[in-house]
Regions:
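Short, active-site-adjacent cap segments at secondary-structure transitions
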Residues: 41, 206-207
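Conserved small/polar residues in nucleotide/adenosyl-binding loops
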Residues: 233-237
Length: 237
């Protein structure tokens, strides 16, 4: 505790909406944090060593990524893991995945336009729309004994609304855990292109897969589509 980490100090409010008066049936040391975004595994030595090396420079000013090596490392990872390549000028840094999502929704959608996503959904897709006073449109996934699939007829119907200008995809899907197959992504891509929509593909959890699963970036399926934004995060890679 006393780290200001969500994993140790913030989970009571974040998950349980609890204040300091709420009593939990277990002691803190008995909890094992295994939520997808913040598992209780130690940071690798190579990362710790890199931070220590940076600390030794003793100068901490405004920071941006200026070195080509960052792009080279990230691009090499995407090529080796997903056989996916992209131009260096298309890699843009942000101050965080959630702030970037909020900013993109407000930038892409005009005040009278709508945001479409699959439900159940990562809650911040709706929060981002709410923050910009944009309407949310939900296309419910089909639940067959815990295996979720896309209702393409419903998705296409809702995407056809000219006021629905942005589709947010979660790939792999949160919270169902579905890793979308290539044919599924192609069908999604066809609907997006047909309606000339913007699409944000949230691929944050792309490397947290079971051994028999394979992540396919939407950008690999739609390599020439100019209204596609892929969200990724190096700290989970």
């Amino acid at each position: 505790s006393h780290t200001n980490a969500m994993n140790t100090d913030g989970f009571r409010d974040y998950i349980f909406h609890a204040d300091e008066t709420m009593k939990f049936p277990y002691q803190d040391e008995e909890f094992i944090r295994m939520w997808v975004a913040d598992m209780e595994f130690a940071t690798p030595d190579v990362v710790i060593d890199g931070i220590k090396k940076r600390l030794e420079k003793r100068i901490f000013g405004y920071t941006r990524v200026f070195e080509k090596s960052y792009y080279d490392a990230f691009a090499a990872w995407c090529k080796s893991k997903y056989d996916w390549t992209f131009d260096r000028k298309e890699l843009v840094m942000s101050n965080g995945i959630i702030p970037a999502l909020f900013e993109m929704v407000e930038y892409i959608c005009k005040p009278d336009e709508k945001v479409l996503f699959l439900t159940p959904s990562y809650a911040y897709f709706k929060y981002a729309a709410d923050a910009s006073h944009r309407e949310s449109v939900c296309s419910d996934l089909i639940n067959t004994d815990g295996y979720y699939t896309i209702d393409y007829e419903d998705l296409e119907k809702k995407a056809a609304d000219e006021k629905t200008t942005l589709f947010i995809l979660c790939n792999p899907h949160n919270p169902s855990g579905r890793v979308w197959k290539e044919e599924e992504l192609k069908k999604i891509g066809e609907i997006i292109e047909k309606n000339n929509m913007w699409v944000i593909s949230d691929e944050i959890h792309c490397d947290l897969l079971r051994l028999d699963q394979k992540h396919i970036p939407l950008g690999k399926v739609m390599p020439d589509y100019k209204k596609l934004v892929t969200r990724s995060e190096e700290r989970r890679v």
